[in-house]
Protein backbone atom coordinates (compact mmCIF):
# COMPACT_ATOMS: atom_id res chain seq x y z
CA UNK A 1 0.00 0.00 0.00
CA UNK A 2 2.79 2.42 0.87
CA UNK A 3 4.36 2.05 -2.61
CA UNK A 4 1.01 2.90 -4.22
CA UNK A 5 0.60 5.96 -2.02
CA UNK A 6 4.18 7.01 -2.78
CA UNK A 7 3.63 6.65 -6.53
CA UNK A 8 0.41 8.68 -6.40
CA UNK A 9 2.19 11.38 -4.37
CA UNK A 10 5.03 11.37 -6.90
CA UNK A 11 2.49 11.83 -9.69
CA UNK A 12 1.01 14.69 -7.66
CA UNK A 13 4.43 16.36 -7.51
CA UNK A 14 4.88 15.96 -11.27
CA UNK A 15 1.40 17.39 -11.80
CA UNK A 16 2.11 20.37 -9.54
CA UNK A 17 5.32 21.25 -11.36
CA UNK A 18 3.66 21.06 -14.79
CA UNK A 19 0.50 22.89 -13.72
CA UNK A 20 2.53 25.66 -12.04
CA UNK A 21 4.57 26.20 -15.22
CA UNK A 22 1.46 26.07 -17.38
CA UNK A 23 -0.50 28.53 -15.26
CA UNK A 24 2.51 30.88 -15.13
CA UNK A 25 2.52 30.97 -18.92
CA UNK A 26 -1.28 30.93 -19.34
CA UNK A 27 -0.98 27.62 -21.22
CA UNK A 28 -4.51 26.46 -20.47
CA UNK A 29 -4.46 23.17 -22.42
CA UNK A 30 -1.19 22.12 -20.79
CA UNK A 31 -2.63 23.07 -17.40
CA UNK A 32 -5.68 20.87 -18.02
CA UNK A 33 -3.44 18.00 -19.14
CA UNK A 34 -1.44 18.35 -15.89
CA UNK A 35 -4.67 17.92 -13.94
CA UNK A 36 -5.15 14.48 -15.55
CA UNK A 37 -1.92 13.11 -14.09
CA UNK A 38 -3.13 12.27 -10.56
CA UNK A 39 -6.43 10.64 -11.61
CA UNK A 40 -4.50 8.58 -14.16
CA UNK A 41 -2.04 7.53 -11.45
CA UNK A 42 -4.92 6.42 -9.23
CA UNK A 43 -6.38 4.33 -12.07
CA UNK A 44 -2.92 2.88 -12.75
CA UNK A 45 -2.59 1.83 -9.11
CA UNK A 46 -6.01 0.15 -9.27
CA UNK A 47 -4.71 -1.91 -12.18
CA UNK A 48 -1.59 -2.66 -10.13
CA UNK A 49 -3.65 -4.02 -7.25
CA UNK A 50 -5.79 -6.04 -9.67
CA UNK A 51 -2.60 -7.55 -11.09
CA UNK A 52 -1.22 -8.32 -7.65
CA UNK A 53 -4.44 -9.88 -6.43
CA UNK A 54 -5.37 -12.11 -9.38
CA UNK A 55 -1.83 -12.38 -10.82
CA UNK A 56 -2.91 -11.60 -14.38
CA UNK A 57 -0.04 -9.68 -16.02
CA UNK A 58 -2.45 -8.01 -18.42
CA UNK A 59 -3.44 -5.71 -15.54
CA UNK A 60 0.24 -4.88 -14.97
CA UNK A 61 0.50 -4.08 -18.67
CA UNK A 62 -2.42 -1.65 -18.30
CA UNK A 63 -0.83 -0.07 -15.23
CA UNK A 64 2.52 0.47 -16.96
CA UNK A 65 0.78 1.76 -20.10
CA UNK A 66 -1.04 4.38 -18.03
CA UNK A 67 2.23 5.43 -16.38
CA UNK A 68 3.72 5.73 -19.87
CA UNK A 69 0.87 8.11 -20.78
CA UNK A 70 1.46 10.09 -17.55
CA UNK A 71 5.14 10.60 -18.38
CA UNK A 72 4.27 11.38 -22.00
CA UNK A 73 1.84 14.10 -20.86
CA UNK A 74 4.45 15.57 -18.51
CA UNK A 75 7.25 15.33 -21.09
CA UNK A 76 5.30 16.90 -23.95
CA UNK A 77 3.92 19.57 -21.63
CA UNK A 78 7.37 20.51 -20.37
CA UNK A 79 8.90 20.55 -23.85
CA UNK A 80 6.06 22.78 -25.06
CA UNK A 81 6.50 25.16 -22.12
CA UNK A 82 10.29 25.12 -22.46
CA UNK A 83 9.97 26.17 -26.10
CA UNK A 84 7.46 28.82 -25.11
CA UNK A 85 9.81 30.35 -22.53
CA UNK A 86 12.72 30.28 -24.94
CA UNK A 87 16.08 28.60 -24.93
CA UNK A 88 18.04 31.69 -23.87
CA UNK A 89 16.78 31.90 -20.29
CA UNK A 90 15.50 28.49 -19.18
CA UNK A 91 14.59 28.15 -15.51
CA UNK A 92 16.95 26.18 -13.28
CA UNK A 93 16.86 24.60 -9.85
CA UNK A 94 19.64 23.02 -7.80
CA UNK A 95 21.97 23.25 -10.78
CA UNK A 96 19.79 21.01 -12.92
CA UNK A 97 18.24 22.73 -15.90
CA UNK A 98 14.62 22.62 -16.87
CA UNK A 99 15.62 20.83 -20.04
CA UNK A 100 17.31 18.20 -17.85
CA UNK A 101 13.97 17.56 -16.18
CA UNK A 102 12.42 17.01 -19.60
CA UNK A 103 15.17 14.50 -20.42
CA UNK A 104 14.41 12.74 -17.12
CA UNK A 105 10.74 12.49 -18.14
CA UNK A 106 11.75 11.12 -21.54
CA UNK A 107 13.87 8.44 -19.84
CA UNK A 108 10.86 7.59 -17.67
CA UNK A 109 8.83 7.02 -20.85
CA UNK A 110 11.48 4.61 -22.14
CA UNK A 111 11.62 2.79 -18.79
CA UNK A 112 7.84 2.46 -18.72
CA UNK A 113 7.75 1.14 -22.28
CA UNK A 114 10.28 -1.51 -21.24
CA UNK A 115 7.95 -2.43 -18.38
CA UNK A 116 5.03 -2.74 -20.80
CA UNK A 117 7.11 -5.12 -22.94
CA UNK A 118 8.12 -7.09 -19.82
CA UNK A 119 4.54 -7.58 -18.67
CA UNK A 120 3.19 -8.31 -22.16
CA UNK A 121 5.89 -10.98 -22.48
CA UNK A 122 4.95 -12.46 -19.11
CA UNK A 123 1.26 -12.38 -20.04
CA UNK A 124 1.96 -14.19 -23.31
CA UNK A 125 4.03 -16.80 -21.45
CA UNK A 126 1.21 -17.27 -18.94
CA UNK A 127 -1.28 -17.67 -21.79
CA UNK A 128 0.93 -20.23 -23.53
CA UNK A 129 1.31 -22.11 -20.23
CA UNK A 130 -2.47 -22.05 -19.66
CA UNK A 131 -2.07 -20.26 -16.33
CA UNK A 132 -5.35 -20.11 -14.42
CA UNK A 133 -5.84 -16.79 -12.67
CA UNK A 134 -7.44 -16.22 -9.30
CA UNK A 135 -10.76 -14.46 -8.93
CA UNK A 136 -10.80 -11.01 -7.32
CA UNK A 137 -12.17 -12.27 -3.99
CA UNK A 138 -9.69 -15.13 -3.80
CA UNK A 139 -6.89 -12.76 -4.79
CA UNK A 140 -7.77 -10.19 -2.14
CA UNK A 141 -8.05 -12.92 0.50
CA UNK A 142 -4.56 -14.05 -0.48
CA UNK A 143 -3.29 -10.46 -0.22
CA UNK A 144 -4.82 -10.19 3.24
CA UNK A 145 -2.84 -13.20 4.46
CA UNK A 146 0.92 -13.09 4.71
CA UNK A 147 2.82 -14.77 1.90
CA UNK A 148 6.13 -16.51 2.44
CA UNK A 149 9.03 -14.08 2.53
CA UNK A 150 11.93 -15.21 0.38
CA UNK A 151 15.57 -14.19 0.48
CA UNK A 152 16.33 -16.46 -2.47
CA UNK A 153 17.48 -14.41 -5.47
CA UNK A 154 15.83 -16.92 -7.81
CA UNK A 155 12.45 -15.69 -6.54
CA UNK A 156 12.99 -11.98 -7.12
CA UNK A 157 16.23 -11.59 -9.10
CA UNK A 158 14.49 -10.85 -12.41
CA UNK A 159 12.99 -7.70 -10.92
CA UNK A 160 15.93 -6.57 -8.76
CA UNK A 161 17.67 -4.41 -11.37
CA UNK A 162 14.65 -2.41 -12.50
CA UNK A 163 13.22 -2.08 -8.99
CA UNK A 164 16.49 -0.77 -7.57
CA UNK A 165 16.85 1.80 -10.31
CA UNK A 166 13.17 2.71 -10.34
CA UNK A 167 12.77 3.31 -6.63
CA UNK A 168 16.12 5.13 -6.36
CA UNK A 169 15.15 7.47 -9.18
CA UNK A 170 11.67 7.98 -7.72
CA UNK A 171 13.05 8.90 -4.31
CA UNK A 172 15.73 11.28 -5.61
CA UNK A 173 13.44 12.93 -8.15
CA UNK A 174 10.78 13.35 -5.46
CA UNK A 175 13.31 15.10 -3.25
CA UNK A 176 14.39 17.26 -6.18
CA UNK A 177 10.76 18.12 -7.02
CA UNK A 178 10.28 19.70 -3.59
CA UNK A 179 12.17 22.65 -5.07
CA UNK A 180 11.27 22.28 -8.74
CA UNK A 181 12.63 24.32 -11.59
CA UNK A 182 10.70 27.56 -11.72
CA UNK A 183 9.76 30.11 -14.30
CA UNK A 184 11.45 33.51 -14.06
CA UNK A 185 9.54 35.93 -11.80
CA UNK A 186 6.85 33.44 -10.72
CA UNK A 187 7.77 32.86 -7.11
CA UNK A 188 10.10 30.81 -4.98
CA UNK A 189 9.62 27.48 -6.74
CA UNK A 190 8.62 25.81 -3.49
CA UNK A 191 5.59 23.52 -3.61
Per-range role (PLM):
Residues 1-2, 153:
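Intrinsic structural disorder
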Residues 2-34, 42-52, 77-85:
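Internal transmembrane alpha-helix with an interfacial aromatic "cap," most often the third helix
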Residues 9, 46, 51, 60-62, ...:
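Generic recognition of cysteine residues
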Residues 40-104:
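Short helix-loop boundary/capping segments
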